[in-house]
Amino acid sequence: MNAPQAPVLVADIGGTNARFALANPTLTSAPLLNDSMREFAVIEFPSLGEAAQHYLHHIGIHTTKGVFAIAGHVDGDEARITNHPWVITRTRTATMLGFDTLHLINDFVAQAMAISVLGPQDVIQIGSAKWEQFPLSAATRNYGIIGPGTGLGVGGLMIRNGRCYPLETEGGHVSFPPSTPEEIRILEILSQQFGRVSNERLISGPGIVNIHRALSEIDGIDPGPLRPQDITMRAADGDIRATRTINLFCNIFGTITGDLVLIQGAWDGVFLTGGLVPKLLNSIQHSGFRQRFEHKGRFSAIMARIPSLAVIHPHPGLLGAAAYARDTEQVPQEIKA
């Protein structure tokens, strides 16, 4: 009889919080083990290794394998978290934890890998185009993924005969394409501050503030210092300029999401993720998002058939790290101290 497979430690590490869970990567759905997720403030620990040690001690299980998704640049053996001073070295962290295998991946690689294990209960359809699921082992698919939060993450996932290949990009830094006279004026205003204006300057938390500030300047109003949540709260209370801001955000989001499909050839669907999507889901559903998504000239009829899905799974980063562990199980990356 074969011994049960040891779980893999998966982590989703951001600038504020570190989330950990145990996963069974052999499970094609729901690979995260029940009640294993814990969240800690990164400021409480001097290093990622010590945060992971704390988790393993707290949960009372030891493992020798890990996949850590990092919200920042991963360069070979080293990763740096955006907006936090941790510098993570893979070999040093693995040695500290007694791991045989440790992978560091970008957080949006994990978000993309999560697509392969999401179920109907984990997504909400935006528009009428339906998402058709197929057994992973037989699937050949191209998906896009886009996620506004502190910045704008963009990536993709190719599936070939059950094997997943995440596409890591910097698509959030593509130049912003205005589609209306009002958006052209907004671009002119933001250009005065930033010079070149990327999509991330509008489709992100700070982007909400930028759009609102530009609209205020057009209206000859000084809005004072505002945070993204201030603007979304004002929109919920019926403030006209804040409502215009959120509507514009959703419309522009639709345009650049459609552009992503065309650029990547993501003909099987695009997934919306990131911290802002659940908060703005109702606005996205009732805005011009889908109309702008489909409005691609000679490709409009094709775009109308492509599903767009908002991810509502609470921990897609952990889910994707587990999926990454599944696909790397046959080709382990050994750690040598």
From Swiss-Prot:
Main subcellular location: cytoplasm
Localisation per UniProt entry: Cytoplasm
* A GO cellular component entry from the record: cytosol
The parts of the chain that form a coiled coil are none
Q: Where does ATP bind?
A: A11, D12, I13, G14, G15, T16
Q: Name one GO molecular function term.
A: D-glucose binding
Q: What keywords were assigned to this record? A: ATP-binding, Cytoplasm, Glycolysis, Kinase, Nucleotide-binding, Transferase
Q: Does the keyword Calcium apply?
A: no
Enzyme type, top EC level:
transferase
Please verify whether the record's keywords include Transferase.
yes
CDD domains this protein is in?
ASKHA_NBD_GLK (cd24008)
GO BP annotations of the record are: glycolytic process
Enzyme nomenclature, EC number: 2.7.1.2
User: Which protein family is it in?
Assistant: Belongs to the bacterial glucokinase family.
Any idea what this protein is called?
Glucokinase
What organism is this sequence from? Xylella fastidiosa (strain Temecula1 / ATCC 700964)
Q: Which gene encodes it?
A: glk
